[in-house]
UniProtKB/Swiss-Prot annotation:
PANTHER family: PROTEASE DO-LIKE 5, CHLOROPLASTIC (PTHR43019:SF23), SERINE ENDOPROTEASE DEGS (PTHR43019). Its EC number is 3.4.21.-. Induction: Positively regulated by agr (accessory gene regulator). This is Serine protease SplA. It comes from Staphylococcus aureus (strain NCTC 8325 / PS 47).
Length: 235
């Protein structure tokens, strides 16, 4: 990848206590001791659902509509987001979908770590964003013990933005909060959490534990959150 596109920067999965969710999480039951480590590298991300996943400096996002990406607020608010381009489904061997400048950001007005990022349609290479990505569909819902996958860019610059997918199980859902045991590392913030049909349940926003995150947490997409996202998809 062009060094001007993805520069080495902060790729930390946000520390749990630094988030507004921390006060809610402390009261939630946690049933797992260590995350599953079922992880595989996605070397060719040109097919669904992988071609809907994008890399930011320090995080991940998922495409949900025309020029529209969902990620975390703490990724969208990064000082680097307007300086560095968004890379569409970059992988180590497959053909990437281009590198795009950020147009604007719409933060969710509530405490949830959720934001919309709009990109310019034409990449620096002359590619069309919407012809080189897929749009991930929303799931109707999810429940405890459902199997999930998390796709993203753990350790971003350290791995030269290789894409990885991990699998696990939902352990708890309460309102817009969910806990699961799919393995995650710094750089997975904003990663889509998908069901077995590759439908979007929510996005990862934090983890606890050291190198092997013992618990991982996501923003669960309730009807209200899905409405916010759908209302901010470019027409």
């Amino acid at each position: 990848m062009n060094k001007n596109v993805m520069v080495k920067g902060l790729t930390a999965l946000t520390i749990l206590t630094s988030l507004g969710f921390a006060e809610n999480i402390s009261n939630q039951p946690h049933s797992i001791a260590k995350a599953e480590k079922n992880v595989k590298e996605i070397t060719d991300a040109t097919k669904e659902p992988y071609n809907s996943v994008v890399a930011f400096v320090g995080g991940t996002g998922v495409v949900v509509g025309k020029n529209t990406i969902v990620t975390n607020k703490h990724i969208a608010k990064s000082n680097d987001i307007f300086k560095n381009r968004v890379s569409a489904h970059h992988s180590s061997k497959g053909k990437g979908g281009g590198n795009y400048d950020v147009k604007d950001i719409v933060e969710y007005p509530g405490k949830e770590d959720l934001a919309i990022v709009h990109v310019h349609e034409t990449s620096t290479e002359g590619l069309n964003f919407n012809k080189n990505v897929s749009y991930t569909k929303f799931a109707d819902g999810a429940k405890v013990k459902d199997r999930i996958s998390v796709i993203g860019y753990p350790k971003g610059a350290q791995t030269k933005y290789k894409m990885f997918e991990s699998t696990g199980t939902i352990n708890h859902i309460s309102g817009t909060f969910m806990e699961f045991d799919a393995y995650a590392q710094p750089g997975n913030s904003g990663s889509p959490v998908l069901n077995s049909k590759h439908e979007l349940i929510g996005i990862l926003y934090a983890g606890s534990g050291k190198d092997e995150s013992e618990k991982n947490f996501g923003v669960y997409f309730t009807p209200q959150l899905k409405e916010f996202i759908q209302n901010n998809i470019e027409k």
